[in-house]
Amino acid sequence: MQKSVLAGLISSALVLVPIAAARADTSVTCMYMLMRVYHAELDHCHIALSKDREDRYQRMKAGMEKFIHANAKQDPNAIISGIETDNIKRALAGLKSCQSDDFKYAIQALDEVTTPDHEKMVQGTLALPRDPQIGDCGT
């Protein structure tokens, strides 16, 4: 339940806020973590994104990693590996089944964040240098 509430709040931050507000207010590290977690859940359940969505996902992932490496005030490798070792593993351990509401939400969220419009929003966000850990992760 907590995951669903958090995911809903974060989805709003990533998908529904105006582009200018998202650029200023959303943590790049948060966006990166959510994309990685949702993608890992789909991988775990053997669900592939369409080629165009996977290509957008990979471009956004690479762009966010580059941004984190260029702008992080803390060790960027530790930030990225922490997402892998903590957030992704915890999400997969908490995934009840590939039929659960949480998993269905992951599919929906990743569909929303792999649209061309969302990729453009992310590109705009990454054009504004700042600490990638500063910003909201769900309002």
Q: Which residues fall in each region the model found?
A:
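Compact alpha-helical subdomains of small soluble proteins
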Residues: 60-139
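Immediate post-signal-peptide N-terminus of mature secreted/exported proteins
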Residues: 23-55
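Bacterial N-terminal signal peptides that target proteins for export
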Residues: 1-9
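C-terminal segment of classical bacterial N-terminal signal peptides
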Residues: 14-21
